[in-house]
């Protein structure tokens, strides 16, 4: 797992849109919602924005310190948002997932839409280069965002699946990174060791290849990592990275690979 320097606690963070990490609170549906924002020094005009969604039991602070996005943003010159889920989880609109947000009917799609809009109003972000990614429940949430919004140029899920019924999906580039030995969100689909019971990673990949009107995928294998990449209409792409024997985890290569995929998408 990628590790980074631990950021400051929420209480000591500035609330303005400053260089470095800041903390922001917005009202969504009568509920105060919070997100962290990392803004690197020397940010160009019209910078990309990556929205990183934590897993169940995770948090915005944990996601910022665990996955190496801030360090990559320094070199890639993009902004990273880390929304905080209610009760450390996300309501993904399906599959009984997950936790308190699902039980209380929290509208996390509305929250993330509002957080992105807040950032676009206050930071020089290119609205055509906004991306969502997440781990586990956060990865599932990234699919829910792809199914229910049109604001993302690409999404990338790690150890996730698609639980939203996704009746009216928007064409969007999609990458899934998933291990074949994942017991919580099984690569082959079906009932996991906890509550997740969803489609297989190849089936989700096929769904989005169909949505995006993709050609036949090209497949390459390097040791225990197999990459399937399909080119699609309007230069979008749909990719599945399969880790033979990989578990329910964020691989060391995931952050860099996701950013390379995002940066290559049309906008």
Q: Which residues does each predicted region cover?
A:
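A domain-start/cap signature at the N-terminus of enzymes
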Residues: 4-49, 75, 79, 104, ...
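Gly/Ser-rich "nucleophile elbow"/oxyanion-hole loop immediately N-terminal to the catalytic nucleophile
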Residues: 41-46, 92-137
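Short substrate-entry loop that stabilizes the transition state in hydrolases
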Residues: 43-90, 152, 158, 164-165, ...
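Short, solvent-exposed loop/turn and secondary-structure capping segments
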Residues: 61-66, 91-93, 144-145, 166-170, ...
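Primarily recognizes the serine-hydrolase "nucleophile elbow" in alpha/beta-hydrolase
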Residues: 65, 120-172, 183
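Short, proline-enriched alpha-helix->beta-strand connector loops that line the catalytic pocket
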Residues: 169-174, 234-238
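Short beta-strand/loop motif that positions the catalytic acidic residue
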Residues: 176-178, 182
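Acidic catalytic loop of the alpha/beta-hydrolase fold
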Residues: 182-185, 247-250
């Amino acid at each position: 797992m990628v590790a980074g320097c631990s950021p400051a606690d929420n209480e000591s963070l500035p609330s303005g849109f400053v260089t470095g990490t800041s903390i922001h609170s917005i009202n969504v549906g009568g509920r105060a919602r919070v997100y962290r924002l990392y803004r690197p020094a020397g940010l160009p005009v019209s910078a990309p924005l990556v929205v990183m969604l934590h897993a169940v039991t995770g948090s915005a602070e944990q996601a910022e310190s665990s996955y190496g996005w801030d360090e990559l943003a320094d070199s890639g010159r993009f902004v990273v948002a880390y929304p905080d889920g209610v009760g450390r989880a996300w309501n993904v609109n399906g599959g009984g997932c997950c936790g308190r947000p699902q039980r209380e009917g929290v509208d996390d799609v509305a929250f993330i839409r509002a957080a992105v809009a807040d950032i676009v109003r206050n930071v020089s972000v290119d609205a055509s280069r906004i991306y969502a990614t997440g781990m586990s429940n956060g990865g599932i949430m990234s699919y829910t965002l792809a199914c229910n919004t049109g604001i993302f140029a690409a999404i990338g899920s790690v150890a996730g699946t698609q639980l939203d019924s996704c009746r009216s999906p928007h064409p969007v580039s999609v990458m899934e990174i998933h291990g074949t030995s994942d017991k919580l969100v099984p690569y082959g689909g079906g009932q996991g060791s906890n509550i997740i019971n969803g489609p297989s990673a190849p089936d989700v990949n096929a769904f989005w290849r169909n949505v995006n009107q993709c050609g036949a995928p090209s497949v390459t294998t390097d040791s225990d990592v197999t990459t399937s990449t399909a080119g699609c209409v309007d230069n979008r792409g749909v990719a599945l990275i399969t880790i033979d024997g990989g578990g329910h985890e964020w691989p060391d290569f995931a952050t860099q690979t996701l950013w390379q995929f995002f940066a290559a998408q049309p906008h």
